[in-house]
Amino acid sequence: MAGILAWFWNERFWLPHNVTWADLKNTEEATFPQAEDLYLAFPLAFCIFMVRLIFERFIAKPCAIALNIQANGPQTAQPNAILEKVFTAITKHPDEKRLEGLSKQLDWDVRSIQRWFRQRRNQEKPSTLTRFCESMWRFSFYLYVFSYGVRFLKQTPWLWNTRHCWYNYPYQPLTADLHYYYILELSFYWSLMVSQFTDIKRKDFGIMFLHHLATIFLITFSYVNNMARVGTLVLCLHDSADALLEAAKMANYAKFQKMCDLLFVMFAVVFITTRLGIFPLWVLNTTLFESWEIVGPYPSWWVFNLLLLLLQGLNCFWSYLIVKIACKTVSKGKVSKDDRSDIESSSDDEDSEPPGKKPHSSTTTNGTSGTNGYLLTGPCSVDD
C-alpha cells in the first residue's frame, strides 16, 4: 500500500520541477492546500443533501402551492394485465409490429394502446410540483454560491490580472475564504453525483454525469497542486448562468410564459458569452499560455488542461443545443419542450376517449400521434 501511495503522490507528476511536498507543508507563517482537507467534502455533501430535503419540503413546496402548482401527477393508465406484463417484462416502447399484435389480441385500436403505454410511462414521472421544488433548490444554491464567488473574487488580484494565478506558484498561501469556496463547491458536486440517481431522470444523464465527474476531478486536481486561484475563476464563470436557467424553469412550471422566455434569453446570452467567450479567451489563455511562460509545463499541468478542454467541449455541445432551441423559440414564439424533457407528452394533447374498438386512426411508426416530440436545449431544459 505504501508503494502505491508513493507512486500516486509522485512529486514529479503533481508538482513543478524542483518542488516537493515538504515545501508545501503548513507552517505558522502560511497555510497551503492539503489533500486531506478534501475529506471534509463528504460529510458536508451529506449536510447539503439534508438541507435540500428540508428546503424543498418547507420552503419550495409552499411557494409552489402559492403559485397554484399542483402535486397531481399524470393521468393513470387503465389497469390491464396483458399490457402491464409487456411494459414491465418486455418493452416500454413497443414497435409497430408489437402494437398491431396487441391490437388484435385485445381488440383495441392501435392509438389506444399507444396512449396506454404513454400514460403508463408518464405514471413514473414526477409531478410539476416536484420539478419546481428541485429547480428552486438549485436556483437558491447557485445564486448563493455565485454571489459568494463574486464577492470573494473582486477582492483578489488574479481577477483583474490572471498572471497573478502563477506568480510565486506553487507557494501561494490558502486563505479561509478560498478554502470555504472550494470545499463548498466540491461538496455540492458530490451531492449532485449522488442525487442524480434519485432526481428527475433526463435523457442526457450520461453527459451530466460526465460533467459532474470532470468538475470534481478539476476541483480536486486544482486544490491538491494549489492551482486554486485559477480554479476559482473556472468555478465562478460556470456558476454565472445556472441560476438564470433554474429561474426560467420555475417560471415555466408556474406558467409565466413571458417571464420564462425572457429568463431563457438572458440565460442563453450569459451562457454563451461566458463559456464560449470569456472562458477560452481568459481562463484557457492563462492556463495554457501564461502558466507555460511563468511556471512551465509538468505532468499534472497537462492533465489539468486536458480536463479544462474536456469541459470546454461540453460547453460547445451545450451552446449548440441552446442556439438550436433559441432558433425554434423564435419560430414558435415561446420556449418549448426539449430533448432533455422527461415528459413525453401532455395528456391534454390527447383525445380522452377510453380504449375501444378499432377505428384505425393514423399513427406514426414511433408510437406517437405525430404531434408529440422534443425540442433540444442545453445543459438543463426549461421544461424538464
UniProtKB/Swiss-Prot annotation:
Organism: Mus musculus
CC terms in the record's Gene Ontology section: endoplasmic reticulum; endoplasmic reticulum membrane
A GO term, aspect molecular function: DNA binding
Membrane topology, Lumenal segments: 1-34
Gene inactivation effect: Mice show behavioral abnormalities including a clasping abnormality of their hind limbs and a habituation deficit. Knockout mice are protected against high fat diet-induced obesity and glucose intolerance. Mice show decreased palmitoyl (C16:0) ceramide pools and increased energy expenditure. Conditional deletion in brown adipose tissue or liver also protects mice against high fat diet-induced obesity, while it is not the case with specific deletion in myeloid cells.
Protein name as annotated: Ceramide synthase 6
Localization per Swiss-Prot or TrEMBL: Endoplasmic reticulum membrane
Domain named TLC: residues: 130-331
InterPro entries according to UniProt: HD, Homeodomain-like_sf, Lag1/Lac1-like, TLC-dom
Residue ranges of the TM segments: 35-55, 174-194, 205-225, 263-283, 303-323
